[in-house]
Amino acid sequence: IYPQIMPGARPSDEIIVLEDTDGDGRADKRTVFANDLLIPTAVLPDDRGGAYVANSSEVVHLSDTDGDGKADARRVVLAGFGTEDTHHILHTFMWGPDGAFYFNQSIYIHTHAETPHGVERLMGSGIWRLQTDTHKAEIVSRGLVNPWGHGFNRWGQSFATDGAGGNGINYAFRGS
Protein backbone atom coordinates (compact mmCIF):
# COMPACT_ATOMS: atom_id res chain seq x y z
CA ILE A 1 0.00 0.00 0.00
CA TYR A 2 1.34 3.40 -0.93
CA PRO A 3 1.54 5.89 1.90
CA GLN A 4 -1.32 8.34 1.92
CA ILE A 5 -1.10 11.81 3.37
CA MET A 6 -3.16 11.89 6.52
CA PRO A 7 -4.67 15.22 7.58
CA GLY A 8 -2.62 16.74 10.36
CA ALA A 9 0.28 14.30 9.91
CA ARG A 10 3.66 15.69 10.89
CA PRO A 11 6.30 15.47 8.15
CA SER A 12 8.92 12.95 9.27
CA ASP A 13 10.74 11.82 6.13
CA GLU A 14 14.44 12.46 5.53
CA ILE A 15 16.99 12.73 2.76
CA ILE A 16 20.07 10.78 3.75
CA VAL A 17 23.50 11.07 2.15
CA LEU A 18 25.57 7.89 2.24
CA GLU A 19 29.32 8.12 1.71
CA ASP A 20 32.13 5.63 1.24
CA THR A 21 34.93 7.39 3.12
CA ASP A 22 37.47 4.54 3.01
CA GLY A 23 37.06 3.52 -0.66
CA ASP A 24 35.98 -0.08 -0.03
CA GLY A 25 32.81 0.25 -2.10
CA ARG A 26 30.50 0.28 0.94
CA ALA A 27 28.85 3.26 2.57
CA ASP A 28 30.30 3.85 6.01
CA LYS A 29 29.08 7.38 6.72
CA ARG A 30 25.44 8.46 6.98
CA THR A 31 24.39 12.12 7.12
CA VAL A 32 20.83 13.42 7.29
CA PHE A 33 20.84 16.16 4.66
CA ALA A 34 17.24 17.20 5.35
CA ASN A 35 14.41 16.15 7.64
CA ASP A 36 10.78 17.06 8.31
CA LEU A 37 9.83 16.22 4.73
CA LEU A 38 6.54 14.65 3.61
CA ILE A 39 6.92 11.83 1.08
CA PRO A 40 9.88 13.25 -0.86
CA THR A 41 9.77 11.53 -4.25
CA ALA A 42 12.56 13.26 -6.18
CA VAL A 43 15.84 15.03 -5.50
CA LEU A 44 17.80 17.11 -8.01
CA PRO A 45 21.16 18.55 -6.92
CA ASP A 46 22.07 21.98 -8.22
CA ASP A 47 25.54 23.40 -8.88
CA ARG A 48 25.58 25.43 -5.65
CA GLY A 49 25.52 22.60 -3.08
CA GLY A 50 21.75 22.60 -2.76
CA ALA A 51 18.96 20.46 -4.13
CA TYR A 52 15.42 20.72 -5.44
CA VAL A 53 13.10 18.26 -3.71
CA ALA A 54 9.58 17.05 -4.49
CA ASN A 55 8.02 17.46 -1.05
CA SER A 56 4.49 16.20 -1.53
CA SER A 57 2.45 19.25 -2.59
CA GLU A 58 5.44 21.49 -3.25
CA VAL A 59 8.86 21.80 -4.82
CA VAL A 60 11.36 23.08 -2.28
CA HIS A 61 14.97 24.14 -2.63
CA LEU A 62 17.24 23.00 0.19
CA SER A 63 20.63 24.64 0.73
CA ASP A 64 23.67 23.83 2.82
CA THR A 65 24.92 27.34 3.55
CA ASP A 66 27.66 26.47 6.05
CA GLY A 67 29.25 23.43 4.33
CA ASP A 68 28.42 20.84 6.99
CA GLY A 69 26.55 18.56 4.58
CA LYS A 70 23.15 19.39 6.10
CA ALA A 71 20.45 21.61 4.64
CA ASP A 72 19.99 24.68 6.81
CA ALA A 73 17.88 26.76 4.41
CA ARG A 74 14.57 25.75 2.86
CA ARG A 75 12.67 27.76 0.24
CA VAL A 76 9.35 26.80 -1.36
CA VAL A 77 9.81 27.20 -5.12
CA LEU A 78 6.35 26.07 -6.27
CA ALA A 79 3.30 24.98 -4.30
CA GLY A 80 -0.17 23.70 -5.08
CA PHE A 81 0.57 20.26 -6.49
CA GLY A 82 -2.10 17.65 -5.96
CA THR A 83 -1.61 14.70 -3.61
CA GLU A 84 -4.73 12.64 -4.30
CA ASP A 85 -2.76 9.48 -5.15
CA THR A 86 0.73 9.63 -3.66
CA HIS A 87 2.37 7.22 -6.07
CA HIS A 88 1.53 9.68 -8.84
CA ILE A 89 2.83 12.87 -7.18
CA LEU A 90 5.82 14.82 -8.54
CA HIS A 91 8.82 12.78 -9.67
CA THR A 92 11.57 12.37 -12.30
CA PHE A 93 13.49 15.58 -11.63
CA MET A 94 16.14 16.42 -14.23
CA TRP A 95 18.02 19.26 -15.85
CA GLY A 96 17.23 19.78 -19.52
CA PRO A 97 19.76 20.73 -22.20
CA ASP A 98 18.27 24.25 -22.14
CA GLY A 99 19.22 24.66 -18.46
CA ALA A 100 15.61 24.37 -17.31
CA PHE A 101 14.41 22.02 -14.60
CA TYR A 102 11.97 19.34 -15.78
CA PHE A 103 9.73 17.09 -13.71
CA ASN A 104 6.77 14.78 -14.13
CA GLN A 105 3.35 14.40 -12.58
CA SER A 106 1.19 11.33 -13.16
CA ILE A 107 -2.52 10.75 -13.59
CA TYR A 108 -5.07 11.22 -10.76
CA ILE A 109 -3.29 14.36 -9.59
CA HIS A 110 -4.96 17.77 -9.85
CA THR A 111 -2.52 20.66 -9.62
CA HIS A 112 -2.99 24.40 -9.27
CA ALA A 113 0.65 25.54 -8.97
CA GLU A 114 1.09 29.09 -7.78
CA THR A 115 3.85 30.96 -9.62
CA PRO A 116 4.88 34.63 -9.83
CA HIS A 117 3.53 34.48 -13.40
CA GLY A 118 0.09 33.15 -12.45
CA VAL A 119 -1.45 29.80 -11.65
CA GLU A 120 -0.53 26.82 -13.84
CA ARG A 121 -3.09 24.02 -13.82
CA LEU A 122 -2.57 20.39 -14.74
CA MET A 123 -5.45 17.97 -14.20
CA GLY A 124 -3.75 14.63 -14.73
CA SER A 125 -0.36 13.67 -16.03
CA GLY A 126 2.26 15.72 -17.79
CA ILE A 127 5.80 17.02 -17.94
CA TRP A 128 6.60 20.37 -16.34
CA ARG A 129 9.38 22.82 -17.21
CA LEU A 130 10.63 25.39 -14.68
CA GLN A 131 13.04 28.24 -15.30
CA THR A 132 14.72 28.44 -11.89
CA ASP A 133 15.92 32.02 -12.37
CA THR A 134 12.46 33.47 -13.17
CA HIS A 135 10.22 30.82 -11.55
CA LYS A 136 8.28 30.57 -14.81
CA ALA A 137 6.59 27.17 -14.87
CA GLU A 138 4.84 25.61 -17.84
CA ILE A 139 3.43 22.29 -18.89
CA VAL A 140 5.29 21.06 -21.95
CA SER A 141 3.60 17.72 -22.54
CA ARG A 142 0.37 16.00 -21.52
CA GLY A 143 -1.47 12.81 -22.25
CA LEU A 144 0.64 10.01 -20.86
CA VAL A 145 -0.93 7.96 -18.08
CA ASN A 146 2.04 7.46 -15.79
CA PRO A 147 5.14 9.18 -17.25
CA TRP A 148 8.09 7.97 -15.17
CA GLY A 149 11.09 7.99 -17.44
CA HIS A 150 12.11 11.22 -19.15
CA GLY A 151 15.27 12.08 -21.03
CA PHE A 152 16.80 14.05 -23.85
CA ASN A 153 18.89 12.81 -26.76
CA ARG A 154 22.01 14.59 -28.00
CA TRP A 155 19.90 16.87 -30.23
CA GLY A 156 17.77 18.03 -27.29
CA GLN A 157 14.71 16.03 -28.27
CA SER A 158 12.58 14.96 -25.30
CA PHE A 159 11.39 11.39 -24.75
CA ALA A 160 9.27 9.89 -21.99
CA THR A 161 8.19 6.42 -21.00
CA ASP A 162 4.72 5.58 -19.77
CA GLY A 163 4.59 3.16 -16.86
CA ALA A 164 0.95 2.28 -17.48
CA GLY A 165 0.12 3.07 -21.09
CA GLY A 166 1.98 0.25 -22.79
CA ASN A 167 3.28 2.61 -25.46
CA GLY A 168 7.00 2.24 -24.78
CA ILE A 169 9.07 5.33 -25.45
CA ASN A 170 7.17 8.44 -26.51
CA TYR A 171 8.35 11.61 -28.22
CA ALA A 172 7.39 14.34 -25.74
CA PHE A 173 7.52 17.70 -27.46
CA ARG A 174 6.17 21.10 -26.43
CA GLY A 175 2.40 21.16 -26.75
CA SER A 176 2.03 17.39 -27.09
Where do the model's predicted regions map?
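Beta-propeller blade termini and top-face loops
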Residues: 1-176
